[in-house]
């Protein structure tokens, strides 16, 4: 069984329950919705169908974030090298061959002569040769075609747009209403952009978790403060590969993953992981290697975009990614391990998590069980990227869904208030039934002696057979609930 989590993008054009169920059984852990391509009605349909399939599937919704786009065109416009174009910030006017209008009125304030304007994910490049104040004059650098409402990137420049659009604010309120689990905020440039979303969530007493999408140089430069302000990070390599030199992407990816592990926060690698499978039933060797390398770098999760949202082989894409992940996890080298413990800093719960992981290697422990109200202990354990699964007992379904982004964590819900001993033995029994444990295997239990808010205080290690053979004399620290 794979330990790397899979996020799959789903469109309202293909979101029936049978389709979602197939992806779920194939290995999908979280459904992602792209608000750039979904109406409110479509979002509601996706959420209702996902919840009908299983309350255990996480749901993530994107914001559009601060972006610049072209305006409408009557028909696609063809450009040749050397064509000269006037560019205005006039969102209310359509574009033509000689005049391109953009959605951002103040574009001339933020762009200088010599900058490249990259249209449609970098497909068309225009270099600015003059800035008159009211308009830019640019020269086309490559032959290409420009359609309506295409993306515009200006590598190396700060575009002074607000962190949230009006549509973003409406979609955040919709996410709160629908009790969605994650908001993936696009084009995050600093902690202030994360705070803009968090302020809305706080105002409405929502516990939705924020995933910050790193898509430009500013986000890379400010990654430490962004990680601190976020629940998790998505390395969105599409726009990132336009905004920064593409040869820098692997190194940026590796460094961000390492920083997230140090912070004990989930990290997702996204974009073009199995892009070929939008149209073909098999991936390229390079795509297989890309997925494996993300796992060798120690990512928590991988994301599929067009492969599952609009591709011809969505189920096969999830199945393929799951198979590659499972094999890559077996092939990982310890030389790439990242120690989440800060040198010179001793934290009790992290020390105990490290001890439990060490036990899997030195004492042959086959699995770790933990429980808690926040999932922090499970995320601490996930940061060590241990070889065996972590079973996290969750006391609410939402926590279970939040942990669907954490490597190696199997979250299950325990709604009934039962004793520590009863909960632990039930968890061991479940692991045995699922084939993770044999009678002679050792199991570790990481928990606290003082109930909710009391912190992690002990590690229990025992043989499965011994636990059940001595059920009357076997004891654990009490959580205040007596065995019946």
Describe the residue ranges of each PLM region.
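Non-catalytic helical/linker scaffolds that mediate oligomerization, partner binding
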Residues: 1-484
